[in-house]
Structure formats: structure tokens, C-alpha cells
Swiss-Prot record:
Residue ranges annotated as motif Nudix box: 65-87
Top-level EC class as recorded in UniProt: hydrolase
Nudix hydrolase domain segment(s): 28-157
Cofactor: Mg(2+)
Keyword Hydrolase attached: yes
EC number, UniProt record: 3.6.-.-
Alphabetized Gene3D superfamilies for the sequence: Nucleoside Triphosphate Pyrophosphohydrolase
Key word Magnesium present: yes
Pfam family of the protein (one): NUDIX
Species this chain originates from: Listeria monocytogenes serovar 1/2a (strain ATCC BAA-679 / EGD-e)
The protein, known as: Uncharacterized Nudix hydrolase lmo0368
């Protein structure tokens, strides 16, 4: 049973929690994270979701993703999801999420890191992750164009966002 903290529109804890799978009431919001891991060559680590996964089964996705559990910060959730799904440890101390997207049911923080990871270092979570690989910007675009990658609206800017230090290019 997965339990989430509920937030208000200002991203403040409400003191209430929610059980995953139950319908959120209007105005109830929760925190989701995505992690984008780039290697030293500038390639993005992506994962293929299991064929029986709820929501986007058998699609390629970003490095790791999930909901923050009760009591977790965005950083803690990001570190935990990477460890659970990919079997590697990351330390996001001293960093901030690259950006946060506000969606109908909450807030989605996107973390970007560069880490020298080898595919042989990964231990994939069998229940959620079918495969993992590194891709270039061009390979990611090909997966998006073929309908094999979850169609995030910002996908064509992902590699630009990786190096961005301001809101301007």
C-alpha cells in the first residue's frame, strides 16, 4: 500500500494523506518526480516500462519516475525511485530539481544529473522496468516519432534543458 502526502495549491502539506489507486478529490494534489540521468557522453539513460505496467505499458520513459511517499521530500523520492527502479544510488544533495510542472493532480519535479553509469551497473526492478539503454538526442527523437516513447510535451528540449543554467537559451 503506497501512501502519499497531500498538498495544497501552494505546495504546502495539508496534513492529509492519500492511498495510491483511490480517486483524488478536487483540490487534492500530490508530488511526482522524474529523474533524467545523462552519462559523460551526454546520452540519456531511458527505461522501458513493463508490458503489464499501469499507464504507458511497454513504452520507453525517462530514467526513473514515481510518486513521493508520505514524509518524503522531492529529493528523497528521486533518490529512492532511482535506487528501486535501476538499482543504483544517486546523491542529489546540494542540487535542486531542474523544473517543476504543475498538472491536474499535483506537482511533477524533474531532476537532471550527470553520472558515469554503465548498463552493467544496473539492477532493473522486474515489476516495473523491462529494459534500459542510453540514447542520443537523435535516437530519442526517433523513439518519440515512432510512438515508442511517452509523449512528454518538452521531449524535444530535453537535451537543451540538461545544460541550461538560466531560463534563456
Amino acid at each position: 500500500m503506497e501512501e502519499w502526502d497531500l498538498l495544497n495549491e501552494n505546495r504546502e502539506l495539508t496534513g492529509k494523506t492519500h492511498i495510491r489507486g483511490e480517486k483524488l478529490a478536487p483540490g487534492e494534489l500530490h508530488l511526482v518526480i522524474h529523474v533524467c540521468i545523462f552519462n559523460e557522453k551526454g546520452q540519456l539513460l531511458i527505461q522501458k516500462r513493463q508490458k503489464d505496467k499501469e499507464g504507458w505499458p511497454n513504452y520507453w520513459d525517462l530514467s526513473a519516475a514515481g510518486s513521493a511517499l508520505k514524509g518524503e521530500t522531492s529529493q528523497q523520492a528521486a533518490e529512492r525511485e532511482v535506487q528501486e527502479e535501476l538499482g543504483i544510488m544517486i546523491d542529489l544533495s546540494g542540487t535542486r530539481a531542474k523544473f517543476s510542472y504543475h498538472f491536474e493532480e499535483g506537482f511533477d519535479d524533474y531532476w537532471f544529473i550527470t553520472k558515469d553509469v554503465q548498463l552493467s551497473d544496473l539492477t532493473l526492478q522486474k515489476e516495473e522496468v523491462a529494459d534500459a539503454r542510453f540514447v542520443t538526442k537523435e535516437e530519442l527523437e526517433a523513439l518519440r516519432s515512432s510512438g515508442e516513447f511517452i509523449p512528454y510535451f518538452f521531449l524535444n528540449q530535453l537535451f537543451n534543458l540538461k545544460n541550461a543554467t538560466t531560463i534563456h537559451f
